Amino acid sequence: VLVGLDRRLDAVYSDAPLSGPVERAFRSVVREYAIPRDVPAALLEGLRWDEEGRGYEELSDLYDYAVRVGSTVGVMMTLVMGRRDAETLADAAELGMAMQLTNICRDVGEDARRGRLYLPARPLSESGMHIEDWLASPAMRPEIANSISLLLDDADRLYARSWKGIARLPSQSRPAIRAASLLYAEIGNEIRSAGFDSVSRRAWTSRGTKLAILARAALFARAPRSAFPAAAGSVGGATGLPDLARQAAAGLVRAASNFRSGAG
């Protein structure tokens, strides 16, 4: 399937006639908004990693994956919303990563029952956990809780750091993006409230919580940019690693911000 998608992407970024309506529509979008091929190609690479069943030994490996399946979406959306400065694109990339980290933390049990583990494997193994045995019979363990806790902390830093980027978006776009970021961050809060157990349960937000978040997002759209100071602190600090998020997304952001016209 993905080989076919690669060929279709090549065709979109060529000058050859296109017969399919999806390809024609996507070519129109990438040309109108100057979306470089590197961005959707990175998304397809992340999907290929999923198809291969790839695991992630280190936190840095997991960020490389999150860039491909999360940051790419944020960057493409930001380009379509008319912003292509490097700072706003970097914030969008980090927001995409934050949402992907939240997804991973929410779906630990669901993924495990399909034989998949996205949490960084080396720290789990070094703590004495036998990953293959655990995947054969998933159950909540302190090592899993600790890994989820660390990832959610990083996700929260990324959500906070994305605020200024959202404030730089067109006013009509801000409420939806802010609402999405708040809803995903709230999923992280629900996981914390359950003692980080996303093996035996799946976190969700109530209708009342969703409505309250939508109201907060609407207020955010009218607030001045100065109301949202940049969040301090690097991501990945708990592991002693450098700022993994911005480093991991740097190439993607550079390609998107420097690409101005044409389809390839």
Give residue ranges: language-model regions.
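Catalytic cores of Mg2+-dependent Asp-rich isoprenoid enzymes
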Residues: 1-99, 105, 109-264
